[in-house]
């Protein structure tokens, strides 16, 4: 993270005492991740409502031999966003998800099958590179949604 330091306020890079530098450095880090940098065309994810029959297929969504921290391992297998719609997932307001075949998404349920569920995209994984906690990544995502409003 130190290598991604960014001087936002003109006083030299100081991620410890300058909020501006700390936030700018974090953004710089997220946009410089080698494999899949931050995508400005896609959000982090969205809260979803599962179909009533989710218990019938929930276990089939789990990854085989996942690698990474527990938050990366707990994500579902990837599916196109349109496939999640076909399974019966909707947004939090019971509206259809966007019909996109070009967007790969995964399901997360940080509090288990009876808790809130989210469909997440690559930007969510990038947040996990910074801090590998589902609670942290979802909190950052939800906060960013509110800031955008």
Segments from the language model and where they lie:
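Helix-loop elements that line ligand-binding/catalytic pockets
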Residues: 16, 20-83
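Alpha-helical segment that forms one wall of the substrate-binding/catalytic cleft
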Residues: 1-39, 94, 98-99, 104-112
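C-terminal soluble interaction/assembly domains
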Residues: 58-149
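Surface-exposed loop/turn and secondary-structure junction residues enriched for glycine/proline
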Residues: 4, 9, 19, 41-43, ...
């Amino acid at each position: 993270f130190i290598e991604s330091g960014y001087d936002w306020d003109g006083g030299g890079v100081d991620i410890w005492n300058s909020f501006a530098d700390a936030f700018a450095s974090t953004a710089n880090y997220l946009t410089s991740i080698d494999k899949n940098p931050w995508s400005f065309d896609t959000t982090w994810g969205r809260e979803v409502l599962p179909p009533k029959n989710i218990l019938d297929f929930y276990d089939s969504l789990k990854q085989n031999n996942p690698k990474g921290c527990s938050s990366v391992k707990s994500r579902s297998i990837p599916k196109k966003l349109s496939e999640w719609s076909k399974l019966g997932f909707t947004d939090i307001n019971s509206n259809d998800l966007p019909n996109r075949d070009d967007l790969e998404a995964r399901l997360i349920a940080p509090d288990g099958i009876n808790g809130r569920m989210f469909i997440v995209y690559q930007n969510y994984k990038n947040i996990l590179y910074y801090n590998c906690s589902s609670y942290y990544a979802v909190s950052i995502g939800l906060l960013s949604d509110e800031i955008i409003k």
